[in-house]
C-alpha cells in the first residue's frame, strides 16, 4: 500500500521533469519565429516539398507527445540515486540531446540553415541512441519511452534531407 503513496516532492519533480522539454522545445520554436520574422507553420508551407510530407499541424502534436515522454523518462532516471555515475552519465546525454533539439529549430527555421540542421539532427540521432543505452542501465522503462523519439528523429532526418536537397 505504501508504494502507492506519492509525496508532494515527487509530484513536483515529475511536473518539472515533464515541463523542461516542453518549455525548451516550444521556446526554440518561438525564438525561430522571432529570428525569421515568420510563423514556422507558414514557413513550412512555403517550402518546396513532396506531397507525402505531413501537414504542419501534425508537428506540434507529435512534439508535445515526445516532449512529455522525454520528461517522464528523465523523471524515472533522475529519481534514482543522483550521485550515481550511471545516473549522472545518462542525464548528461539527456540534457545534451535537449540542447541539440533546441538549436535544431533555430537553425532550420530561424536561420534557414538546412544543411547545418541536417548535420545537427544526425548528431541528435547518435546522442539519443547513446542516451537510450545509458537509460537502459538505470531504468529500462525510461529507455523504452524514448524509442518513439528515436524513430521520429530518423523520420525528421529524412524530411530535413529532402527539404534541403529540393530547396537549395
Regions found by a protein language model. Give the residues of each.
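Terminal transmembrane helical module of multi-pass membrane proteins
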Residues: 134-168
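Non-cytosolic membrane-interface motifs at loop->transmembrane helix junctions
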Residues: 110-123, 144-145
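Core segments of transmembrane alpha-helices
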Residues: 63-74, 97-100
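Membrane-interface helix caps and helix-loop-helix hairpins in membrane proteins
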Residues: 104-116, 137-138, 164-168
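Membrane-interfacial loop-to-transmembrane alpha-helix junctions, especially the N-terminal start
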Residues: 85-94
Amino acid at each position: 500500500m505504501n508504494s502507492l503513496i506519492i509525496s508532494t516532492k515527487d509530484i513536483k519533480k515529475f511536473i518539472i521533469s515533464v515541463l523542461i522539454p516542453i518549455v525548451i522545445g516550444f521556446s526554440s520554436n518561438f525564438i525561430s519565429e522571432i529570428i525569421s520574422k515568420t510563423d514556422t507553420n507558414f514557413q513550412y508551407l512555403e517550402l518546396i516539398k513532396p506531397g507525402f510530407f505531413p501537414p504542419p499541424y501534425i508537428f506540434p502534436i507529435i512534439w508535445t507527445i515526445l516532449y512529455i515522454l522525454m520528461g517522464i523518462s528523465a523523471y524515472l532516471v533522475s529519481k534514482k540515486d543522483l550521485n550515481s555515475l550511471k545516473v549522472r552519465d545518462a542525464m548528461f546525454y539527456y540534457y545534451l540531446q535537449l540542447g541539440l533539439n533546441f538549436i535544431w529549430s533555430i537553425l532550420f527555421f530561424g536561420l534557414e540553415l538546412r544543411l547545418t540542421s541536417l548535420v545537427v539532427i544526425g548528431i541528435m540521432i547518435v546522442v539519443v541512441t547513446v542516451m537510450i543505452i545509458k537509460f537502459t542501465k538505470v531504468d529500462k522503462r525510461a529507455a523504452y519511452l524514448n524509442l518513439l523519439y528515436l524513430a521520429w528523429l530518423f523520420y525528421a532526418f529524412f524530411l530535413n534531407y529532402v527539404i534541403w536537397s529540393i530547396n537549395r
